[in-house]
Amino acid sequence: MLPFNSCVYVLLIISLMSNCRALCRATALQGRSLCATGGPDAAFRAEHERLSAFESRPSSGSYDMRRALDPIEIETWFHIVSGETDADLVTDEMVILQLHYLQKAYEKASISYRLKGVTRHINETWARNGDDSAMKKALRRGGYSTLNVYFQTNLQPPSTTDFARWTSDGDNRHAYNSDLAPPSVLGFCTLPDPSINSSSPRSSYSKDGCNVLAKTMPGGPMTHYNRGGTAIHEIGHWNGLLHTFEGESCSEDNAGDYIADTPQQSVPTDGCPSQKDSCPDSPGLDDIHNFMDYSSDDCYASFTSNQLKRMRDMWFSMRKGK
């Protein structure tokens, strides 16, 4: 018979699973993710398949060359949303360091981020993600091609209602459960939506953007996750990338993240191991240093060449001019 504490833990996991439409999986308490939910819908997967075919064909001229080489500059807004007791948590220096890390992480893709502004707000409800829709309706700036990042000081798991709604929308997020209560969400972000076009009303993309726990910014108090890596990971989703362990299977039928040069991976990485091979019968070790894994910040280092190319192609296909 399980000890009482173990029974409580098992019941908690069962309860969480009953509220998730998508896969929920338990990991170590100090890992980047307790419950990975949601995922790309059929239309988004089809776009990845189309771009995979596009990228594998020979270049057809000057347009392809420009698409491959032209620098991409993304207008960006940072919104610092704090509770009253955390009003001074995010300093100007942390904002500067986060932006610097963002520029460095994406420079090999020739993608840069032009910070249009930083807004600061003290709102207990928004700081804990109590009303995501109202917050974004009030704070969001720019069109669909504008990146909005919401750094919230007490970002919490969504309510059961919001949880079901978000997963049905196909958003990507990951939750973090420390040994401190209550559990916090490190971040979540929207994938590009193939249905959005230049004439789409603002209401159709009002939730677009990335929510990031402010404590993960450079210099924040989240040990092993305070170098700014969460924002890099989430913005990778905004740029169209999936997790390196997408599908969580070694099966040949699993398309994974639709990126040819990321090795097959069946489980997220926890922390920063010396190496890991979750699919030993497939070529290559798990890319534990990839920004789209769940490794700790001290392990994060890079995107692959094909990930860099895919983000550029996603920009031209899904966000530019919208």
Curated annotation (Swiss-Prot):
EC number: 3.4.24.-
Signal peptide coordinates: 1-22
Keyword line: Disulfide bond, Glycoprotein, Hydrolase, Metal-binding, Metalloprotease, Protease, Secreted, Signal, Virulence, Zinc
Main subcellular localisation: secreted
Top-rank lineage group of the source organism: Eukaryota
InterPro entries in alphabetical order: MetalloPept_cat_dom_sf, Peptidase_M43
Species of the source: Aspergillus fumigatus (strain CBS 144.89 / FGSC A1163 / CEA10)
Function: Secreted metalloproteinase that allows assimilation of proteinaceous substrates. Plays a pivotal role as a pathogenicity determinant during infections and contributes to the ability of the pathogen to persist within the mammalian host.
Protein name per UniProt: Extracellular metalloprotease AFUB_008060
One GO cellular component term: extracellular region
